Amino acid sequence: MICHVATLDGTYAVDVDDELVLGLVDSPVEQERVPLELPRLVAASAAGSTVVALVERRPPLLVSSDAGSTWREAGGGLPAGFAVAVHPDEPDRVLFAARNRLYLSVDGARFWRALEPELPDIEAVAWV
């Protein structure tokens, strides 16, 4: 699966499964706008009834499986984040962007693994 990562140096295509930076692409990353009224909200992403909110606190994520009616905390071991993206067809696949590294969850934001590539100053991330 491929994602686009907006950085200060441009937008990179990243193969998430093979953990490879495929190169720069000429495509802007539109940060998803999810209408949420949560304190200290940094970014949010949704697919179906799954909503993942990145907040400026520890742990950095709030996850809802019922479109925001109830929430659970997630990402206790993650660093501060800048962006998040829920895969539109597989809502258990979630990308979390820290300053220069992507983290992937394949189980609805319960467990995370750092992806190998480091990128310069990540600003946004989106599945493509």
Predicted regions and their residues:
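Extracellular glycan-interacting surfaces
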Residues: 1-128
